[in-house]
Each structure stands twice: as C-alpha cells, then as structure tokens.
Amino acid sequence: MSQVLDDLVALLSLEPIEENLFRGRSQDLGFRQLFGGQVLGQSLSAASQTVEDARHVHSLHGYFLRPGDAGLPVVYQVDRVRDGGSFSTRRVTAIQKGQPIFTCSASFQYDEQGFEHQTSMPQIVGPENLPSELELMQQRAHLIPENMRDKMLCPKPIEFRPVTASDPYNPQPTEAVKYIWFRTDGSLPEVPAMHKYLMAYASDFNLLTTSLLPHGKTVWQKDMQVASLDHSLWFHGDLRADDWLLYAMDSPWAGNSRGFSRGSVYNRAGQLVASVSQEGLIRHRKDWA
C-alpha cells in the first residue's frame, strides 16, 4: 500500500469520541472547500460502526448543506433510526464549527436470496494501455494555476484512467457521456466495509462534471460556480476498490443552474456493483463573463 493510500484509509477510519459520535480528519485536495467524497466516505464509516457486521450497507442518500473547511476536522453524529428484522437505518450529520455541513441516511440489510437481473456492462476498451489522469495532468502542468499545481500533481491514492481524455483547459461541447476506469494505488485490507467507504469517496470524482460536457465548460473556468448539491449511492454487493472498476457516467438533463448526472460501476467480470446519482450546481457567473 502506498503512503497516500495508507493516509486515505486512515482518513476513512474515524475516531469514536462518544456514543454515536465520531471525529474524522480532513484533507486538502486543492479545491476551494472540503471534497464531498471525503464527507461521503466518512459518513458511511460512522454509520457502519453503529450497525452489526452481518448487515451490509446497500444505499446512502445525502445532501450537502454548507461548504466544508478542509483545514478542520469533521464531527459525525449518528442517529440510530431503526433496527428492524432485516434492515437497519441510520441518519448521519456531519458538523463543523457547530453547523451541519452534510446530512445523509444509510440503509443496511442482511444478505438474502431473491430475484436477480442487471444491465450489461458497456463494451469499453480496458484500462491497461490508457494514460492516467495524473499523467495527462502532468502533460499540461504549465496550464495549472500555480497556487494549485503542487496539489494537482502530487501522488494520488486512487488512479483514474479516462477512456476518452478531454482537455480541461480548452473544453469543446461533446456528448454528456463519460467512461473512467479506477482503482486504489495498491492493495487494501480484506475488510469489505473499507472497500465501500473508498467507493463512496471515489464516486464523487468526475460525476458532476459530466453535466458540463455538452456546454463546453469545466470546473476550472472562473466564470463557473460548481458544487455538489446531493448524492445517492446504491451498493449491489461486495466490491474490490483495489481492482479495476469501470465508472460509466451520463447526464440526461440540466436546467435552472443544476445538472443531473448518474453513474453505473462495473467490475472486470461485468458485474454491476454500484449505482450513483447526483445533482449539482452548475451556475454561469455572469459577473465573470
């Protein structure tokens, strides 16, 4: 396991500070505020620590309420809403400076047999010969703002390999579809829950920007105000975040300064292991035009 991946695993392993209360460290990825994927992964970690191991998370639905401060820790308060015969429900509130910055509900279930079907995995080129996002970024290092360059070019705990690379500094309108392979930069412990925390963390990368593709816009442009508003994630079974996963994303709609994006995550065997949806703010700031 690389040092940056070890740091991420530690980030998602929260400190219990009281019954139903947990504290997590923060990381600065060079964004203007706390990365939403961190809060998603840590919220799931907090909820999972209040549920028996035999019940596995199958869904999480959350709202981003305020920008988080990447320089401060986050406190997670868990409400044990219900433990039923098959399902457990938890409500989690992420708090900074005494204010909620994120809230979500997560549902857990015992494994059981039932009807099964899934959509087929898209026929997409494999990841082996594709350049990573980091390699593509290094090729354009001179275009990255100097105050963000070190953060953008440092080693990453998760390797993303886009199937079709686009130029974030010279975007052109294109179809609102994106395919990206990803996996952690190294092997993970044999702890299924940690693989799901990392899936939640990774699911917030690249999804929102899919809704910008038809408009020839990126998050790097000064005339764009972009932020995640909500996030939903469904787990369809166990997954391995340290083996290649295909993130197939599209955006069927945008309007009223909001973009809606959805994603399907497949393993190399073609199994659908997770589904994602998100609505985000994609506001054109006319004062910069």
Where in this protein do the model-derived segments appear?
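Terminal targeting signals and extreme-terminal segments of soluble enzymes
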Residues: M1-A289
